[in-house]
Amino acid sequence: MLRKNLYWLLLCLFLAGCGMIDYHPYDVHISGETNVNAHNIEKIEANCKGKTTIRFAVMGDSQRWYDATEDFVKEINKRDSIDFVIHGGDMSDFGVTKEFLWQRDIMNGLKVPYVALIGNHDCLGTGEETYKTVFGPTNFSFIAGNVKFVCLNTNALEYDYSEPIPNFTFMEEEITNRSDEFEKSVVCMHARPFTGVFNDNVAKVFQHYVTQYKGLQFCTAAHTHHFRDDILFDDGIHYITSDCMDYRTYLVFTIAPESTSENPDYELVEY
């Protein structure tokens, strides 16, 4: 009788515990939408086709600041002039799977499409694998109107320099890929040169490739958590860095037919 009662007690405890079983934080168990960037790039290219003027928002480093990111989404949704949003990376703090899913679900509340770059924190643990599943390749490009956006993984430090980051082969291919479809270009990254995470040994080579893009307007970055507008090399190209979400700001860029690299048209918006 005692053995029988013990059996039923253990069975009840086991069944009760089944509902409490959780996945390991780095298990890359993905629920919900995957390949987000590809889906949204289709929308961006379709929505902007034929446009000669485009306007887009840039932000980044939303890790930890979920409330501020939710408020950013609400802020953008109030505007009717934004074509799309670029998230400059660092959606996660520790590369935990759920961090990516929480951020994805918040950003999916935008009324306009968005793309997300990979940041250095997103590479921690199994973060890169999660990023690739949820968002897609770490290097990608798209065309909005007549402007090509080249989005790069520049987080060399997180790979211990064991992989070609930046990927110069990808950058070179994108110089001519779909070249008849764009007149201007923008290069986007999480960590710009000379920020510690970037492989500064190849900074000049990187800039050589950057300046080969047709009608280069400027470069965007995140990572430092502070707004900056820097000319890093002797070529006049602006590297414009967004604040982290904790500061509740974002950048809005406008690229029109008359736009040039000498004077990028943008505003720092507080919300």
Features from the language model and the residues they span:
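N-terminal active-site segment of His-dependent metallophosphoesterases
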Residues: 18-102, 182
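Stable alpha-helical elements in mature extracytoplasmic
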Residues: 52, 65-72, 88, 99, ...
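Active-site-proximal beta-strand elements of phosphoester/diester hydrolases
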Residues: 53-63, 146-156, 186-188, 238-244
